[in-house]
Amino acid sequence: MGSGNWIVDNLNSALEMWNGRLAEIWQLISTSPESFKGGGVWNVIVNINDGLKAVGYALLVLFFVMGVVKTCGSFTEMKKPEVAFKCFIRFVLAQAAVSWGMELMTGAFRVAQGMVTTIMDSSGLTAMSATTLPDELVSVIKDVGFIDSIPLWAVTLLGSLFIWVLSLVMILTVYSRFFKLYIATAIVPIPLASFAGQPSSSIGVAFLKSYAAICLEGCVIVLACVIFSAFASSPPAIADDTLAAATIVWNYVGELIFNMLVLVGAIKMSDRIIRELMGLG
């Protein structure tokens, strides 16, 4: 419901956009890929994964032969029981990884999702704290005359634009995490087939590290939201009321946008943060 003041309504509209995206993130971060958007996307990914298993098995043989050729200097060395047994075990394990890659990936995601749920429960938050305009600021804006309100229009438009852009960047980053999960899960038979050969196994190791980082991004995102919620519970203080109304609003909006930038930056860099902290880079 409008307040009857265009400036207040414009700021409230931007904050409603921000609060809505935060609530959506809080819900998305606890959603599994299987139930995301009704599970329709997941069904397509499962079909693609099944189709790529044939390619994975073909690469399995190729990587195995390449590994045997590079690690064994001659056919005589290959005839040694310990060498042949080692190659056989590697091939069997790689074949199992290709066959059960989907189960391995979903299992790893469930572990990470359990960590996210634990962080949410430990924080004591059932939902994100909404960011609202203080009553004092609303009173200052409503008491401004028409001529003096002209600078406020510019400040309000600029601040609202920043808040809208930050909201979109934040939610797009969270959605991109789901897309990365889907892409990694779809192609999992191909990189896991590289474990059949010792020289090519670095491909599989790099893939597993990347997938672990994608799963653990949720922990960083939820921690950033919890920290911001604590900031939101103590909104920026209103500056000296003897200042011009435009200055008071600009100081408030500037501090509010700074807090939002911290959250968006943490969410945007969640992949980099988790790679640096866990050594997954």
Regions found by a protein language model. Name each.
Residues 54-66, 158, 163, 181:
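Hydrophobic alpha-helical transmembrane segments
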Residues 45-53, 85-89, 93, 142-146, ...:
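Alpha-helical membrane-interface segments at transmembrane helix boundaries
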Residues 1-11, 81-101, 204-215, 270:
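Alpha-helical transmembrane segments and their helix-start/interface "positive-inside/aromatic belt" motifs
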Residues 95-187, 221, 225-278:
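Non-cytosolic segments of integral membrane proteins
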